[in-house]
Regions:
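A generic local secondary-structure boundary/capping motif
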Residues: 37-39, 62-63, 91, 106-107, ...
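Electropositive, beta-rich accessory/interaction domains or terminal extensions
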Residues: 1-71, 76, 110
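Compact mixed alphabeta submodule
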Residues: 96-119
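Non-catalytic beta/alpha edge segments that cap or flank active sites
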Residues: 113-116, 120-310
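Cysteine-cluster motifs in flexible loop/terminal segments that predominantly coordinate metals
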Residues: 79-95, 296-308
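Short, basic/aromatic beta-hairpin or loop at an interaction surface
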Residues: 38-48, 85-100
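Short, charged beta-turn/beta-strand-edge "cap" motif at the junction between a beta-strand
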Residues: 71-73, 78-79, 109, 118-126
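Mid-chain, well-packed structural core segment of small domains
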Residues: 53-84, 216-246
Length: 310
């Protein structure tokens, strides 16, 4: 039996907490396919729940599952392995980065081996989900307070968005690209707004990193997500002299904003954009959970430091 709470996830699990990756799940069918290469026990990939009948990667983030009284909401697809992942060292691959998913607990309760798992119908009008990334060398070193990021969060919240993540990064293209890919592909947020790094100095790399991860260019959105306002209205916005990019990666719109609070305030207002909503078939389905696992180790997961649920 496992006990789950919204505040922590799985009680006694070392990776629990008030965050979006409280519970990890893997499809039983994916594990069986991997076993044709090498035998692994349930829990070897660090998963908490092994479930039959679901191809999790084909489901959109925010999918909700009912297991008895427990309700889980899928929050992320995949996660890169740690450098000391034993399975990856032995076989050259691990299925968790591409097949594993994570969820938060919306409603707590008990889970038992063999409980039925139901995919719940999607919400009729879910809020749009966003992330905010501030690019600043000095800010990342603690030498300057980030004022633009919180301002953007305030604007997004006022417009009805749910801000899933905020982060402060140095002006490094590699780090920015990695986070843009993770937020767009793994977390599937509707909108990513970056602030900073759009000027003309050698360290201003935000547009280049943004274009590098893009599937399509979306220049019209530089006049505001959904094109609701224009930057050309007087008085001139402090952010006009900018190399900012606006692109699409999958179903995620990525828009670069200037770095200063004044320039951010001079940008177009953010409005909810219905076209950002994913339209995916979402049918009610049920599966059967095979075996729960509780990760009891405080460090990266190893097959040797996992414990089966009692």
């Amino acid at each position: 039996m496992l006990v789950l709470t919204p505040e922590w996830g799985i009680v006694s699990d070392a990776h629990g907490g008030n965050w979006h990756r409280q519970v990890s799940l893997l499809s039983a069918e994916k594990i069986e396919a991997f076993r044709k290469k090498i035998w692994v026990d349930y829990g070897a990939f660090g998963e908490n729940l092994v479930i039959e009948g679901f191809d999790f990667r084909s489901l959109p983030v925010t999918s909700r599952f009912a297991i008895g009284d427990v309700v889980l909401e899928m929050t992320q697809i995949g996660k890169e392995c740690h450098n000391d992942c034993v399975i990856k060292q032995q076989t050259g691959e691990c299925i968790m980065p591409r097949e594993g998913v994570f969820a938060r607990v919306l409603k707590g309760g008990e889970i038992h081996v063999g409980d039925e798992v139901a995919l719940l119908p999607p919400l009729e009008d879910p809020p749009l989900r966003a992330a905010v990334i501030t690019l600043s060398d000095k800010g990342s070193r603690g030498e300057r307070e980030d004022k633009s990021g919180p301002l953007i969060v305030e604007m997004l919240t006022a417009a009805g968005y749910v801000v899933e993540e905020t982060m402060l990064l140095p002006d490094e293209a590699k780090a920015l690209k990695a986070q843009l890919i993770r937020l767009a592909d793994g977390r599937q947020v509707n909108l990513i707004l970056t602030t900073g790094g759009t000027g003309f100095s050698p360290r201003d790399i935000t547009p280049e990193a943004t274009y590098a991860v893009a599937d399509r260019n979306a220049p019209g959105h530089r006049r505001g997500p959904c094109g609701t306002h224009s930057l050309s209205h007087p008085p001139p916005s402090p952010g006009v002299l900018s190399r900012a990019a606006s692109v699409l990666r999958g179903k995620t719109l990525i828009v670069n904003l200037p770095g200063s609070p004044k320039a951010v305030q001079g940008e177009p207002r953010v409005h909810p954009c219905p076209s950002l909503r994913a339209r995916r078939p979402h049918r009610r389905r049920s599966g059967r959970r095979v075996r729960p696992q509780v990760n009891c180790c405080p460090a990266p997961q190893h097959p040797s430091c996992r414990a089966a649920a009692r």
